[in-house]
Amino acid sequence: QAIVGERQVDARRCISYLTIEHDGPIPHELRPLMGNRIYGCDDYQLACPWNKFAQRARVPDFDVRPALDSPTLLDLWSWDEAMFLRHTEGSPIRRIGFVRWQRNLAVAMGNALAATDSASEHHGALLTALHAWSARGLFTAPGREDDGALVAEHVQWALGQAGP
């Protein structure tokens, strides 16, 4: 949806922009298009003809981090801010901050709910995790009330994707 014409990209519709740079609510019409992407989108890397020459970087900073090696959405959703900071230390992911991280996860969880059978164990676990977050209320530090409201709005949207 970000490619709007020949050699034209609308960055406001780009998944990388929405998940990394954009600090407000993600537009409703773009949320389903994000799928399970919570930090950027490297689809352009797959399409780039020059990448057929790419080689694996031999720099430790580019190695897979254990906490980010194939985690589930539920694993990532269970992190508190301290865990987020610990697991993203030295990673570019850290710069989005914990609030955008949770916002992006809520969208991905909503999309997972829309794509899974409502009778499945995974569907139930996603619902339970989102409802648990909602039940805690907006416990945010003074001056950070807007952060809680941003995540709450995306959690409510995600819950709405569960179907009947």
What are these regions (language model features)?
Residues 66-99:
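Alpha-helical adaptor scaffolds
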Residues 85-87, 117-135, 142-143, 164:
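Amphipathic alpha-helical scaffolding segments comprising HEAT/armadillo-like alpha-solenoid repeats
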Residues 11-30, 81-85:
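Short, charged low-complexity linear segments at domain edges
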Residues 101, 139-152:
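Positions within the helices of HEAT/ARM-like alpha-solenoid repeats
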Residues 102-108:
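HEAT-repeat alpha-solenoid elements in large eukaryotic scaffold proteins
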Residues 1-16, 37-39, 43-61, 129-130:
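Iron-sulfur cluster-binding cysteine motifs and their immediate structural context
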